[in-house]
Amino acid sequence: MIGVGSAIRYAISKIKKDADADDYFWNALIWCILSSMLFVFAGIFFSADIMRVLGADEHIVAVGNNYTKIFMCFAPMFMCNYVTNAFVRNDGAPGIAMSATLFSSLFNIVFDYILMFPMNLGMEGAALATALSPIIGMGICSIHFFSKKSSVRLVVCKPSVRKLVAGSQLGVSAFVGEMSSAVITLAFNFVILKLAGNVGVAAYGVV
């Protein structure tokens, strides 16, 4: 919501030639980092409880607790990746944004295997592969930021609640779409968990 909305607000402000248009990029990054601290805190102290609320039994909690903890501790990377991707896409470089998404996903798939099996890191390795993938995405997006074609400038400024609200208003539709997908997936998981247990949920996740 913050990333997509701020990127749209930035594009509108740039067209209007507003002097503070570039502030939206830094502002979005700062607010994403600040809000992601809630996920980091929850991941460190309440990862097992979160898994239980989402329907995991004690066996799954024992196996996946470290995965959840590592994954949530990297929340700042995931949220900042959404911001950089949205700004690159709105700055006339959708190809780079798509490449960032594609290669970060490929990195995740390949390093899931490498870290889990050859390096024998198990679920922690899978979590690290997933957690590091947004860094790859941001690295690819930075190619655009450092190019001459980029109009996005990283202007350090104080976090602005007004700009946060202005950006978030335009990102509500994206937020609703993401939340709808999450709720549907969660509902399916609960139903399948009752019908087929953990194996059924795993099979549904693969499909």
What does each model-identified segment do?
Residues 1-37, 41, 78-97, 203-207:
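Small-residue-rich hydrophobic transmembrane alpha-helices
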Residues 38-69:
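Short membrane-interface helical motifs at transmembrane helix boundaries
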Residues 64-68, 127, 198-206:
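Small-residue hotspots at the loop-to-helix junctions and early N-terminal turns
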Residues 56-64, 68, 75-102:
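Cytoplasmic helix-loop-helix junction between adjacent transmembrane helices
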Residues 95, 105-139:
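Membrane-interface helix-loop junctions in multi-pass transport and translocation proteins
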Residues 62, 130, 141-181:
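Interhelical loop/hinge segments that connect adjacent transmembrane helices in multipass membrane
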Residues 32, 71, 97, 101, ...:
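Residue-level signature of transmembrane alpha-helical cores of multipass secondary-active transporters
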Residues 51-58, 114-121, 175, 182-207:
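Helix-terminus/linker motif at the lipid-water interface of multi-pass membrane proteins
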